[in-house]
């Protein structure tokens, strides 16, 4: 409940926006007559998927959104790559053969999120080197900007000094001519 003319703003919980986007996408795709019942069924299905696969799309989406605000959240392993949640390719192939067609599509979609880690230490080292290079570049750019400002201030000071000398000399010559 909001208070009229109040400056308070409530924060939307992480992952809630992603859940609503997913629900909205499915509503637009299916065009159901009874939207609340469809939403209830959608969320029940989502809970079942989460319990079966130990993969929470809301948590994953929150981390993806958080990437833009806090890149340190992605230094650790994402939830879909942790040891307890890896899906073996053999199990997926067996499940595809034994499951009905609709479930196979759902499983294929879920598998698309799982990737095998490939030489992550090398990538981390490259990322650290890139960050160091970027920091060095930013420091150099900052020093260059500071040097430009110092030069501009000095040139301005020098120009004002010359202008004052010229003005004083023209004033002296004008005074001599008037006398």
Swiss-Prot record:
Highest classification ranks of the organism: Eukaryota, Metazoa, Chordata, Craniata, Vertebrata
Cross-referenced CDD domains: DD_CABYR_SP17 (cd12100), IQCD (cd23767)
Biological process according to GO: binding of sperm to zona pellucida
Ranges for domain IQ: 143-172
Function: Sperm surface zona pellucida binding protein. Helps to bind spermatozoa to the zona pellucida with high affinity. Might function in binding zona pellucida and carbohydrates.
Keyword presence, Membrane: yes
Protein name: Sperm surface protein Sp17
A Gene Ontology molecular function term of the record: calmodulin binding
Keywords (A to Z) from UniProt: Membrane
Keyword Magnesium: no
Compositionally skewed regions (Basic and acidic residues) per UniProt: 72-109, 161-170
Gene: SPA17
Biased composition (Acidic residues): 116-135
Subunit and partners: Homodimer. May interact with ROPN1.
Region described as Disordered: 72-138, 159-179
Expression tissues: Testis- and sperm-specific.
A Gene Ontology cellular-component term: sperm principal piece
